[in-house]
From Swiss-Prot:
Is the main repressor of the genes involved in the de novo synthesis of purine nucleotides, regulating purB, purC, purEK, purF, purHD, purL, purMN and guaBA expression. PurR is allosterically activated to bind its cognate DNA by binding the purine corepressors, hypoxanthine or guanine, thereby effecting transcription repression. Homodimer. Residues 4-23, 48-56 bind DNA. The keyword Ribosomal protein does not apply. One of its GO terms (molecular function) is DNA-binding transcription factor activity. It comes from Vibrio vulnificus (strain YJ016). PROSITE patterns: HTH_LACI_1, HTH_LACI_2. The lineage of its organism: Bacteria, Pseudomonadati, Pseudomonadota, Gammaproteobacteria, Vibrionales. This is HTH-type transcriptional repressor PurR. One of its GO terms (biological process) is purine nucleotide biosynthetic process. The gene is purR. It comes from the Bacteria. It holds the Pfam family LacI.
Length: 334
């Protein structure tokens, strides 16, 4: 097995130079980099991660806790994180928790044992139990990427769900809709509570009376959207528009309503939330609230790198602002 000395000898440079090229820890002339990397390829040299971590006190690995990586919103954020990890020479360890505390606890312990340089947390709800578990590992830099209370030991990115809920509802109202239903995720989720607050604020500003029976609880997946569509279609006095708290439910709702013979948006308008890639290509293309998912991933990784370099820095909170994306699923009725 080739060693760093073999690489240095073949490239005609010092072992220190080889180390800087491989670890990207100092500027090295491009011609020298090419010689070193050519020698690395010829010798099939692979640096020892264990030796490097002992010497540099870093493993160049990042852990990421997510509720479910197959969720289209999460997957686009993860893609952004992974891309920037790769560019910076970091390895990403992805931990799917399913929202189960025992898995969250075990993964955090495993990441601590692996001496990861930092942890990104993107769970569908940051419970008090999970917050306490994260705070027990205060020595590991962390960024909380979405919902839940602000951890005393972590930086946080806030998605401003209340603002997004307000924007979606106001757009429906501006297009003449007063009979508006909303399909939420689980009511106890912080993001859902905030989006409902935004929904209610827009309705109150427009002096529109709320029908609490039209605030439906889902689970951010298609199955509950199908059940909600069946319920809405069965009502004699139906809403003219539905605000869905994510695009997955919006697309599921639209599909089922169309199966039941209701046209979108002629018979009922729909607005979603997240602006996942699929939303643009559905028929009709979905009007929605955009969250900058890949930028969230990039910013979270950059913030975490800053925290890794300066663990004593004051805790930071960064805000992201949702934006309306107008497509073809909202009918103007005034």
């Amino acid at each position: 097995m080739a060693t760093i000395k073999d690489v240095a000898r073949l490239a005609g440079v010092s072992t220190t130079t080889v180390s800087h090229v491989i670890n990207k820890t100092r500027f090295v002339a491009e011609a020298t980099q090419e010689k070193v990397m050519k020698a690395v390829d010829e010798l099939n040299y692979a640096p020892s991660a264990v030796a490097r971590s002992l010497k540099c006190n870093t493993t160049r690995t990042i852990g990421m806790l997510v509720t479910q990586s197959t969720n289209l919103f999460f997957s686009e954020v993860i893609d952004g994180v992974e891309s920037y990890c790769y560019r910076q020479g970091y390895t990403l360890i992805l931990c799917n928790t399913g929202g189960i505390y025992e898995k969250q606890r075990d993964y955090i312990r495993m990441l601590a044992e692996k001496r990861v340089d930092g942890i990104l947390v993107m769970c569908s709800d940051l419970t008090e139990e999970l917050r306490e578990m994260l705070d027990k590992h205060a020595d590991i830099p962390k960024v909380i990427m979405d919902w839940g209370p602000i951890s005393s030991q972590a930086d946080k990115i806030i998605d401003n769900s209340e603002e997004g809920g307000y924007l979606a509802t106001k757009y429906l109202i501006d297009n003449g809709h007063t009979k508006i239903a909303c399909l939420s995720g689980h009511f106890e989720k912080a993001a859902c509570q905030e989006r409902i607050q935004g929904f209610k604020r827009a309705m109150k500003e427009a002096n529109i009376t709320l029908n609490n029976e039209w605030i439906l609880e889902g689970n951010f997946e298609c199955d509950t959207a199908v059940m909600a569509a069946d319920k809405i279609a069965s009502w004699q006095d139906r809403p003219t528009a539905v605000f869905c708290f994510n695009d997955t439910m919006a697309l599921g709702l639209m599909s089922r309503l169309q199966q039941l013979g209701l046209r979108i948006p002629e018979d009922i308008s729909v607005i979603g939330y997240d602006n996942i890639e699929l939303a643009e290509y559905f028929s009709p293309p979905l009007t929605t609230i955009h969250q900058p998912k890949r930028r969230v991933g990039k910013n979270a990784f950059e913030i975490l790198l800053e925290r890794i370099k300066d663990k004593e820095h004051d805790k930071r909170v960064f805000e992201m602002h949702p934006e309306l994306v107008v497509r073809d699923t909202v009918k103007k009725i005034n």
